[in-house]
């Protein structure tokens, strides 16, 4: 959430920044409601003070045995006025909060402007052994009899997958490898619920805007779209001591997404699923450290691709392609020979104080309070890593080779990849 006082003071600046992110709301109306709410608040405080004075006068008159009827009538009139004003205040407060929760974060000043992904900026390409073309991961998995699309469709419909044997073991090995990498970089591992309440999704920014992409299980509960939601919301309505930051958290979870806006896109295989595995990294840092923390987050994720010897590139997203809550995002895109292009495998974002304001998470040194900055990123999306390994290291008649160290490990044999 953006501080409404800042919006009021820098209205033209916020209009321009939010317009670059595709925001279509009326900031003038938001500021007008904010001013009206403040005006009512001042009036309420004045009348409540008058009523308190009147109550004391009534008490004094009563002690003296003098008439209090006129004063009581005045007090009742003030009570009625307070009730009406309080109702107006509550309505405005609710409307203002709803609008503020629907306003996206503004892009950082160094984020390139643009309407869509065509304006994204490639920062770096890292190339290893790279096939220019080849079969896709579904064909490879079915040839190896380790991926069963028909079974997944029978069980759950489209955008699901069944893995078995060595491929299921490889996925488990990748998860362990990624968690070990996170631990070596100072992240504390968490096990978190896979079902969260609406307040949690409001805190990180998935609600209210992206309600259609969430899997609701009823009674205000949802399946998590990413471990970012439970990890970050652990500190909702909490005060964090400056002595305890940076806080670095990680979790492996399944993630659930309705993919409401992607009908017909990537329906084959593991590119875009309703259920997928991911290792998430989350940071709480001092505001002065968040830019450096984003670079470190990207490095933590890209180092995994380096160790797996998968070709990738770093891409900074333009303003129009940024997520709702993000101030700046750097994607890692892995090379997929079957598509002859790079596809996203990690998205690392700096949210600044956008999420902590929504969650009412404070940073305190004992005397003053501010809002810490949050960051998160995937390290990595497990399914997309798995399919990238399949496509980049598949050799007909041999199987799929995964390099997690200088020595190759053959997934068609008994040895599995590890972080060693």
Model-derived features: positions:
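TRNA-binding/sensing appendages of the translation machinery
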Residues: 77-216
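A domain-level signal for the structural core that forms small-molecule/cofactor-binding pockets
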Residues: 187, 194-199, 227-243, 257, ...
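Acidic, His- and aromatic-enriched active-site or binding-groove loops in soluble protein domains
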Residues: 208-225, 338-341
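Hydrophobic alpha-helical segments, chiefly the membrane-spanning helices
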Residues: 414-420
């Amino acid at each position: 959430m953006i501080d409404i006082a800042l919006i009021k003071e820098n209205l033209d600046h916020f209009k321009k920044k939010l317009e670059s992110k595709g925001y279509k709301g009326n900031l003038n109306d938001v500021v007008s409601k904010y001013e009206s709410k403040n005006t009512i608040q001042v009036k309420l405080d004045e009348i409540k003070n008058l009523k308190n004075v009147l109550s004391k006068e009534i008490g004094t008159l009563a002690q003296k045995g003098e008439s209090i009827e006129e004063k009581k009538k005045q007090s009742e009139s003030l009570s009625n006025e307070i009730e009406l004003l309080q109702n107006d205040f509550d309505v405005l407060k609710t409307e203002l909060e709803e609008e503020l929760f629907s306003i996206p974060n503004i892009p950082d000043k160094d984020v390139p402007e643009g309407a869509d992904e065509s304006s994204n900026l490639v920062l770096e390409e890292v190339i290893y052994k790279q096939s220019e073309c080849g079969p896709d991961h579904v064909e490879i998995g079915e040839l190896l009899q380790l991926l069963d699309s028909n079974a997944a469709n029978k069980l759950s419909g489209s955008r699901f997958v069944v893995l078995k044997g060595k491929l299921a073991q490889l996925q488990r090995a990748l998860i362990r490898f990624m968690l070990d990498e996170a631990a070596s970089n100072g992240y504390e591992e968490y096990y978190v619920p896979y079902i969260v309440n609406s307040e949690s999704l409001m805190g990180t920014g998935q609600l209210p805007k992206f309600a259609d992409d969430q899997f609701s299980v009823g009674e205000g509960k949802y399946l998590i779209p990413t471990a970012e939601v439970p990890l970050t919301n652990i500190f909702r309505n909490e005060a964090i001591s400056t002595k305890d930051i940076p806080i670095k958290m990680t979790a492996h979870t399944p993630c659930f997404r309705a993919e409401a806006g992607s009908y017909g896109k990537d329906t084959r295989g593991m590119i875009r699923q309703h259920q997928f595995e991911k290792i998430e990294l989350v940071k709480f840092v001092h505001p002065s450290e968040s830019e450096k923390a984003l670079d470190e987050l990207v490095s933590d994720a890209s180092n995994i691709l380096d160790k797996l010897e998968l070709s990738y590139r770093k891409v900074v997203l333009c303003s129009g392609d940024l997520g709702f809550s993000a101030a700046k995002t750097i994607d890692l895109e892995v090379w997929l020979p079957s598509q002859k292009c790079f596809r996203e495998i990690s998205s690392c974002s700096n949210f600044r104080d956008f999420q902590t304001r929504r969650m009412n998470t404070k940073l305190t040194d004992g005397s003053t309070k501010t809002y810490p900055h949050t960051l998160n990123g995937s390290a990595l999306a497990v399914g997309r890593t798995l399919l990238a390994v399949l496509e980049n290291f598949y050799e007909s008649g041999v199987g799929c080779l995964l390099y997690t160290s200088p020595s190759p490990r053959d997934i068609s044999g008994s040895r599995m990849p590890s972080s060693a």
